[in-house]
Amino acid sequence: TTADVANGGFVVGAGLQGVRPIYVVRYQGFQWYNSPMIVNYASKSKEIWNRPCPIFIRSIAMEGGMGPVAGSSHHSLYQRMPGTKIISPMTPKEYEFAYKSFMKEDDVYYVSEHGRSYDNTEELGDVFHDEPDVVLFPISITRFDAEEARKELEKQGIKASIIHQLWIKPFLFTEIWKRQLNSSKFGGIVLDDDYEQGVASSIAHRMMLESDKKVYTMGL
């Protein structure tokens, strides 16, 4: 066996040789050990030395007694580094899209997966309301929970729109999303399986700068 800190170096070497390695990390929390070589070399290699180092990182999140560092999603660790794209597919077609996108490009792809999504066979569509009370922007596994929350809120007479977040980085705040947020009564909430002080806060801040509403965050 090898240490987690060594595996990142192996895949970086493979990426530099054009192998396009798929790196499976069993628990996202272990990215604290697996990520240093990737984010400090592979992610920067293309921009600094004009030598791409494409790596497809399958980073798997899980819940339930996994320990203080092993559980939940940790995609925020990769967000601040240039040259890294972050995507969080939760459906079969989304995952197929993620892989095909990676094969067309030469960037580092951090694929934030979640074990709970593996049994899912259905696609997830956005839900729009005219003048909603609130707009939910769920990421990762919170997308399924957002659907359940929407149904419960509707029973209470609260209209909640849902705009599913597939791409984390680059984040594109589309005009349709902006109109939906601006037409809401109370603003939006970014839901994430990671800590609030990371991807969720960054996306919420971006939305507030480009809209007229407040956007809150919840780390679930």
Summary of predicted features, one role per range:
Residues T2-A6, V12-F137, R143-D145, A160, ...:
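Conserved thiamine diphosphate
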Residues D4-N7, N50, H114-L220:
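Thiamine diphosphate
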